[in-house]
């Protein structure tokens, strides 16, 4: 998927996914460190600054990236900050990387709202997931004047039709994004997706919007902050209902885009300010949104299909120039 998605933004990356089957919430910090270093030793021959470049995702953070960079540098016998992204600033990380996924989603929401003549201020928003992306996203939108009427984590969901106090929730959440277990009155994830709202953002895990609940969604805009949260059948249903669905390959690309920026900065040995990073990110995402939305309107197809058409076309063009086809 990433191989086809990244050409949408003209990023010279391929793509791949990997992970470890574990629950870091049940592990000590020392166990997480040993596991992180062991993972790097296992994949070290396949990764590197000029091979595959790992980046953070679910249940990872800058500390884990730092351990991994340190382990790879020990194996490589050379300080290799460009081996991995999402690092702390002091180890060659990029300004803005920690909130880049959320900022990318905000940019996608702004562009989608503009197409639907919707104001962010006062809009009712539901966010599934309150981890790194979900919590930063909630804070961004809250500060823009949106009403966050529902959020969820792994243990349940919270709802307030008048808008939740996001600053209070952020102050109470733990390092894994858990907050609902502190409240007696919660709702289920099923009920979360049925809430009356203008914008729905699945920012947790895959396959959350299916043909079983797609008809219950009341939002007019759905923006995918998670990877693959909507099934193909649900995508068809939402599109037929006139709901604007902004696909994950576009909406959740803020993180990987700034990971690319981090890699570029590591290679150059020259680092940008957070304002520069955010400006470059906005430029990339707004251009990609315009291209995808225009194609979807011209061909009367959903934005996911339009995004894949663009990504696959650019990938195929590169392959032809290299003599692969």
Language model: regions and residue ranges:
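Adenosine-phosphate binding glycine-rich loop
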Residues: 112-113, 216-325
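Rossmann-like adenosine-cofactor binding region
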Residues: 156-245, 250
